[in-house]
A protein has these predicted regions:
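Membrane transport/envelope proteins' first extracytoplasmic loop
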Residues: 1-270
Length: 270
């Protein structure tokens, strides 16, 4: 359990660091976030995404983690510049960069694989400010599966700077007034987490059921369409066969008439 000073505790509270972080294998949508927001004890809930990526800076490839800027949770503290105004702008780690970076661009390196690239709406982002983030209270920035396994810093990007169908994580803050990481806080969070997870699970399961139902309906519609086309094709085939039979009958009748005419001609000659 981390030992936090009064200053750190105040910082965490002022920046609205999350109390719970939920993850779902099928992700979260706006309805899931709204369902969690309505749960007892919830102050704020926000869907988010993050993505590790390789950025070539100063002729070296380093790995950074891009986080989505969220409202009322995990609020950054601007140390220089301004907040992003659109999806192609970003904030960068104030402990890793100087103000000289403001106005420069971050490029999602070509050495990133396609799965990484598709997380980002743009290939470059303009740095408009430096910031601290409550997600990184201490010096270390964490580990990653990319590069040498070490994160060099963070980047903060607005939601419309990412390209995703669902949120990959859901942050929640609660109404408790207990000292952070105290026994009372831990006890409260244990109960609170059950409430929040139940609300999230119910919403996600309902969405999964809808998706499954929609998928089954699409399959049923496709099967019905296939059967209709099959029946239509069989009808057309039967019609074509009937026309062919009629044609054969006409030919046979014509041959008989021709034979009769020939016989009549032969009889006349005799």
């Amino acid at each position: 359990r981390p030992i936090m000073s009064a200053t750190e505790t105040a910082y965490v509270k002022n920046t609205k660091l999350y109390d719970l972080r939920l993850i779902s294998t099928i992700g979260f949508d706006a309805d899931d976030v709204a369902a969690v927001q309505k749960a007892d004890g919830v102050v704020a809930a926000a869907g988010s995404v993050n993505a590790d990526f390789i950025w070539q800076h100063d002729n070296k490839e380093r790995v950074y983690r891009a986080h989505m800027l969220t409202d009322n949770i995990n609020e950054p503290v601007l140390t220089a510049g301004r907040m992003p105004e659109n999806g192609s702008e970003c904030l960068i780690d104030s402990s890793r960069f100087s103000e000289d970076m403001i106005g420069q661009t971050i490029e999602i390196s070509d050495s990133n694989d396609e799965d990484t690239k598709k997380n980002f709406k743009y290939s470059t982002y303009t740095v408009v400010g430096l910031a601290d983030s409550p997600l990184y209270i201490h010096t270390l920035r964490g580990t990653t599966s990319l590069g040498d396994g070490t994160l060099q810093g963070f980047v903060l990007i607005p939601e419309d700077g990412f390209d995703f169908e669902y949120y990959t994580e859901l942050y929640v803050t609660c109404t408790d007034e207990f000292p952070l990481y105290s026994d009372a806080y831990d006890d409260y969070i244990d109960t609170f987490s059950d409430t929040v997870e139940s609300a999230a699970t119910a919403s996600v399961n309902a969405r999964f059921d809808r998706l499954t139902s929609d998928g089954k309906a699409e399959i049923s519609d496709a099967e019905n369409e296939l059967n209709d086309k099959k029946a239509e094709a069989e009808t057309e085939l039967a019609d074509a066969k009937a026309q062919l039979d009629d044609a054969k009958e006409t030919i046979t009748s014509g041959e008989a008439e021709l034979a009769d005419a020939k016989k009549q001609l032969d009889d006349a000659k005799a």
